[in-house]
Design a protein with these regions (language model features):
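A structural micro-motif
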Residues: 34, 69-71, 91, 117, ...
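Generic beta-structure capping elements
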Residues: 39, 53, 76, 124, ...
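Catalytic core of membrane glycerolipid acyltransferases/transacylases, capturing the structured
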Residues: 42-100
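Short secondary-structure boundary/capping segments
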Residues: 26, 40-41, 63-64, 85-86, ...
Length: 222
């Protein structure tokens, strides 16, 4: 493991367990209601990649309700300065430079999956509010391919739609839909690049469908 990856791995998310009871209380006080559909699609144990829509800075905080175990987050490197950086590292976040992603960040994510952790990545690469979903690049699919090569097992990718009503503000209603997991093997093509594109398109289609259900018609059924 590279030096930067070893430094990241030395920071354990011990604050996650300490703040867990207060986290639930904070959410119940701030938001009017949080509704979750599709819990049956969420693997109990890792390795797993959770791939949510990214609408707000609240997303990681809200989505942490999906697991009592620490969730590891790949987060924009500009969020890691000062006290904020100290806190979010100990909540399970690790940095990535979105403008120039480093190999060490990818390697660290692979090592987390090898350790059977739950990893949350926002496939849009940042907060997107002006459209239902930004077109996805193949970075997440590439990570899945690398992780499966290293672990020798299939890594489920779980699309997650999230909607705030009316928006991500005080007393908003939050609806989360966990969608069926995707597997790289189901998108196998004649060459590696085509396979990564196919998985990316599958993830994008699942997220678009999930977001459409949450924002237009009747909520999904349990």
């Amino acid at each position: 493991m590279a030096a930067s990856s070893r430094a990241q791995a030395s920071v354990q998310p011990w604050l996650y367990g300490v703040l867990l009871p207060w986290h639930r209380l904070l959410l119940s006080l701030y938001f009017r209601r949080i509704i979750i559909y599709g819990f049956e699609h969420l693997p109990i144990n890792g390795p797993v990649i959770l791939a949510p829509k990214h609408f707000s800075r609240w997303d990681p905080v809200v989505l942490a309700v999906l697991s009592v175990e620490p969730l590891w987050f790949m987060t924009n490197a500009n969020q890691f300065s000062g006290v904020q950086g100290w806190v979010i590292r100990r909540l399970g976040a690790f940095p990535v430079d979105l403008a120039r992603p480093q190999v060490s960040s990818l390697r660290y994510a692979v090592e987390l999956l090898r350790s059977r952790q739950k990893l949350m990545l926002f496939p849009e690469g940042g907060i997107v509010r002006d459209q239902p979903l930004r077109s996805l690049k193949t970075g997440l699919a590439h990570l899945v391919q690398q992780a499966e090569t290293r672990t020798g097992e299939s890594i489920p990718v779980v699309p997650i739609a999230i909607h705030y009503e009316p928006t991500a503000t005080f007393r908003a209603k939050v609806t989360i839909q966990i969608l069926p997991p995707l597997f790289l093997a189901d998108y196998e093509q004649s060459d590696k690049k085509a396979t990564l594109i196919a998985l990316t398109q599958g993830l994008e289609g699942a997220l678009r469908s999930g977001m459409q259900q949450l924002t237009t018609a009747t909520p999904p059924q349990d």
